[in-house]
Amino acid sequence: MKKRIDYLSNKQNKYSIRRFTVGTTSVIVGATILFGIGNHQAQASEQSNDTTQSSKNNASADSEKNNTIETPQLNTTANDTSDISANTNSANVDSTAKTMSTQTSNTTTTEPASTNETPQPTAIKDQATAAKMQDQTVPQEANSQVDNKTTNDANNIATNSELKNPQTLDLPQSSPQTISNAQGTSKPSVRTRAVRSLAVAEPVVNAADAKGTNVNDKVTASDFKLEKTAFDPNQSGNTFMAANFKVTGQVKSGDYFTAKLPDSVTGNGDVDYSNSNNTMPIADIKSTNGDVVAKATYDILTKTYTFVFTDYVNDKENINGQFSLPLFTDRAKAPKSGTYDANINIADEMFDNKITYNYSSPIAGIDKPNGANISSQIIGVDTASGQNTYKQTVFVNPKQRVLGNTWVYIKGYQDKIEESSGKVSATDTKLRIFEVNDTSKLSDSYYADPNDSNLKEVTGEFKDKISYKYDNVASINFGDINKTYVVLVEGHYDNTGKNLKTQVIQENIDPATGKDYSIFGWNNENVVRYGGGSADGDSAVNPVDPTPGPPVDPEPEPEPTPDPEPSPEPEPEPTPDPEPSPEPDPDSDSDSDSGSDSDSGSDSDSDSDSDSDSDSDSNSDSESDSDSDSDSDSDSDSDSDSDSDSDSDSDSESDSDSDSDSDSDSDSDSDSDSDSDSNSDSDSDSDSDSDSDSDSDSDSDSESDSDSDSDSDSDSDSDSDSDSDSDSDSDSDSDSDSESDSESDSDSDSESDSDSDPDSESDSDSDSDSDSDSDSDSESDSDSESDSDSDSDSDSDSDSRVTPPNNEQKAPSNPKGEVNHSNKASKQHQTDALPETGDKSENTNATLFDAMVALLGSLLLFRKRKQDHKEKA
């Protein structure tokens, strides 16, 4: 069976297509599936200074049809939507009475150069959501922003299918992706909790080094506000802080003031600046004329904002303005849901706050005992250094279930390879795998510390279990597992400007039954967009305040009184972004949550024909106790020629143990031609006292033809439970051993005086009946249905009682899924005894009679020879 890890949208061949509307955009979602996964994606983005956030949850009921993958109608519910538009850092400057020439000479305008055009957001077609883009008009310069939009498409379709070889993959890139099987079709789903996009952001010149004087003592902050104090960071949630500031007295170029964040909060979100000197550029504070009043940066390590005044402020005083900055969770310092202190220091003045993080759970999957469960999160994207790296955390089996034949696929795309900038390959991707000791200690934020004692690195054990044979896909064979694993991904994306889309998939079966194929998937996407902002710093011009904060006082009053409450503007209709000169402020918080599920069960039926040839090996254990006293006078001359031909073909198994203690005196001349394999171990205790003088002339010709029927009775108790799936023809040759135990007690007393010259001819036809009793106890694991037709021939020449030992028979492991036909056949054979074909009583009498005649003849012969010996003496 071939499975595929993709699906293409808008393919109506044999798949149902549903139309639904999210926000103001209508999109079509087609559920053609690679790997059996119906991806239902969403978009999200984050803003640094100008941010729009919307959250939508979509859910659907389970649906299933034979060999048809249908995506149910999604019921779209718009949740609380808050839009913060055009948050702009601004300043208003009151100047002292100076000449215009002086003011002009001390005033400069600094604008960062921009050489690249602003990347336009890549349209995400045929998805479950459409991101709204805010149209912002900036007078002179646009600063980068990160739009946050989150959509949750929960489309759970659980299917029990009977699929063979679920790990087989096929990854064509151009044809519709399907997954089907003659015995069932899997219809999983993908949950997309948060989607982000990533466009290459051109590095922005950082703020000037703070070489001047710290003027925190001259800066007063007021009207501090948090946009919200509770949100879900795993659903692209974040908040904004807004405050007014006023500079008392005069400052000069190079002077600066600071703002510091607490441990539980960050200003960069999930954008990684570790390759950019851990410094993130912040939008400049500008005047209405576009003059840069102050340049700002954010230090990732110290969580400190630094606002450095430019020479614009020289010879000016009473500068006042405002700023609004996005705040995100610190996944390492706030790993669990809860309320954290968020006390923010602005210009050495503390503003006490508390923020509640309501992380959506990373433990997600199919709600069945053997259901696949996996989730992932992009926790860091380098947008500034040009190295184009990202970091991703994957939780494998977070529900800690017992799963069989588990495979995990980490993809650098979702629907189509050409629609993502992700690069997954042996050279572009580094994987580290950890075994989790205590699943309850996993973070809600997807943060995983490699040095955590709760994580045991087992990457070396997967050296030969990681492959990249499919384009842009890493395949990991976890096999049979009952523990949770964390996979840390260090990947790359290209410079095409496309969104970074990733997908993780887990598939497995129920190890107890070998059926119930289950699959679950998870989507992530990152987008960094560009926005703009403006500010005012010239006292001669009334500022325009596009931000939802307190307005800047346009008049040069010594005590400006700003409005106490920021009021956000109405949400604009989604229109394409203009192409401003980008000064990126890529603050993004990357989180996503997606899942796909499917279940399938398989049952196999096989017919088998079996031919068996058996070769018997008989082992006889005889014990006789003979006490004879004879006085015989005979003269015999015996010439015996015996030709014996025995052929035994028996289906039995025996072990023989014999101990022989024999005290005998015999003289025999025999010629035998025997085609049999016999191992005889006799235990005989014979005490014979014979005084025989015999003279006999005997000519005997004997022909013996024996035919034996073997009657075996076996009792077999087998318990089988197996994972088998095949059609097989088997031929078997069996060697059997028999164990016979015979005991005879003979007491004869004879006295004879004979002189004979006999000429005897005997024709002997013996029929022996062998009774074998075998007790076999076998235990095996098998779950199969098979019809077995076996034909065996057994022909044995033996006079024995066979008691084979207990045989423990165990069904062999069946890695390829073939049905073990021997279980059922052997069980039937062991419980049905062979029919009796001989007459036991007659055979026994004939045997005793032959033994007595042979004994009498030997006594007469012995006596005759003894007598001849005496006469010669």
Curated annotation (Swiss-Prot):
Domain notes: The Asp/Ser-rich domain functions as a stalk to allow the ligand binding domain to be displayed in a functional form on the cell surface.
Ranges spanned by the short sequence motif LPXTG sorting signal, renumbered to the chain: 834-838
Positions of post-translational Pentaglycyl murein peptidoglycan amidated threonine modification: T837
Region (Ligand binding A region): 45-542
Organism in which the protein naturally occurs: Staphylococcus aureus (strain MRSA252)
GO CC annotation terms, alphabetical: extracellular region
Prosegment location in residue numbers: 838-873
Family: Belongs to the serine-aspartate repeat-containing protein (SDr) family.
Name of this chain's protein: Clumping factor B
Keywords per UniProt: Cell wall, Peptidoglycan-anchor, Secreted, Signal, Virulence
Site location (Cleavage): S197, L198, A199, V200
